[in-house]
Amino acid sequence: MKSPFLCAVAIFAAASSASAQYPEGHWQNYAPYPQPTQEVGGAVVNGKLYILGAYGANAPGGLAGWLNEYDPATDKWTKKTDIPMPVHHQAMTGFRDKVYVFGGGVKISATSDNWYPTNRVWEYTPATNSWRELGPMPTKRGGGIALVLNNRIWVLGGAGYHPLQTDDVSISANVAHRTVNTVEVFDPATGMWETKAPMLVPRNHLAGGVVNGRIYVMGGRIGSSFVGASSTDAVEEYDPATDTWRVRARMPYPRSGMAFASDGKLIYMSGGEYLNRDMVGVFRNAEAYDPARNLWYELPPMSVARHGFAGGIINGVFYTATGQLQSGTGGGGPGGSPAVEGFVIGKPAPGGTR
């Protein structure tokens, strides 16, 4: 088994016995991300990877709507039109020939850590390099994820207003808010929303994927959406035929803020952060979850430990881009990493290297 990234303030324990020997593959470096940042969203459309967002010191005013497109055929990044309303911690996915963005947080000022959760929805068309706003999502929230199943987009989890809070009050670590287990489904063909059975564990900063017609969610923060909250290793499976959830094998390491993607067989996940009152750190670790066997495989680790980054699978490569190098309480500053690493699935490294 591979060792976790060792933080100056914490050493993480070995993986659970549920982990198995990893499938073949190796990590490879690609063209660096042109606008390093954190808390981004990612989507794959027509064989290209789109990364949206800019949160922290590298963004003007602390938040910007940067959109960059990566073409694996040329190993080049291209700047695209910014989203009209910059957000962070948005849920994002590709569906057919478009990119969809759901919710997220809007900073109230460049110097404040407070933010407003939003329910605004945006659609980006790569063919015209243009954005348009769609009807709102039912629930205002950020830190959720978006997955595609049965020609609809499922937005899961996140954090938003506390039931006793008003919508005109910003959220911070010291202001009442709640992590949600909400599942809302968007139909791009009609613009309509439907609510489904909630997850068993409310969570934000989670990961997930779709395999064989079922949704899987894993990890994330529970309780608060801010640094200092506990991370979970809980994994759940959703069956759309019965609108029910069930528990599956736990992750090897509890954490949040991972990059993730699925190739339709396995769900790949890397990086992330772990923090509570006793420990804080960022992971290099990578794993793959096999729903058919309900097993986790440990993969070789990334070179650069990161969280708040995004991933996508294109032509058998699990790409990961940008992200923060240290935990929010680790003293690393609010900038970002230019690192772009891809796990080449099923191919050993040339010369036996990583």
Task: Tell what function each PLM region has.
Residues 1-6:
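Bacterial N-terminal signal peptides that target proteins for export
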Residues 7-12:
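Hydrophobic helical h-region of N-terminal Sec-dependent signal peptides
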